[in-house]
């Protein structure tokens, strides 16, 4: 499980870049130009396409918003109180297996990749929220264990 010490600006930036790439892949996979017409012969396929497109893009929007909140926190634009109060990552349902079955393997893999990405962020968020805000940072705790005084 992620600990508070594992969240830092570099990790958030890396995850943010990954989220942007994944979001762009989702956008291209679910671009509806021509896909709805092709699927219109089967209503169930059209419903599955619409539902999973909405679910997957919303999952990625929530992920990007969570990452933007953490970027703002590390840039000093949000306080820890604001981040804890308003920056929680929402729970999000996974794709329904029967709907996933109508997609080609590449689209299914993309949907599952967004689910895994969201689950990673959720673990990081939960680990960060479990930390006591008054507890010393990992560096301060290490210094204390080593008996080194902080420079100041």
Predicted segments, located by residue:
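Surface-exposed peri-terminal alpha-helical interaction modules
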Residues: 1-152
């Amino acid at each position: 499980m992620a600990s508070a010490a594992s969240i830092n600006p570099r990790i958030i930036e890396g995850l943010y870049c990954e989220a942007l790439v994944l979001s762009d892949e989702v956008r291209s996979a679910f671009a509806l130009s021509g896909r709805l017409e092709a699927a219109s012969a089967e209503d169930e396929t059209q419903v599955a396409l619409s539902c999973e497109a909405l679910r997957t893009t919303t999952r990625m929007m929530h992920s990007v918003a969570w990452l933007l909140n953490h970027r703002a926190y590390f840039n000093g634009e949000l306080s820890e109180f604001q981040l804890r109060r308003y920056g929680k990552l929402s729970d999000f349902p996974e794709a329904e297996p029967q709907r996933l079955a109508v997609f080609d393997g590449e689209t299914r893999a993309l949907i599952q990749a967004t689910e895994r990405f969201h689950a990673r962020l959720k673990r990081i968020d939960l680990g960060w929220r479990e930390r006591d805000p008054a507890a010393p940072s990992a560096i301060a705790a290490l210094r204390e264990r080593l008996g080194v005084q902080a420079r100041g």
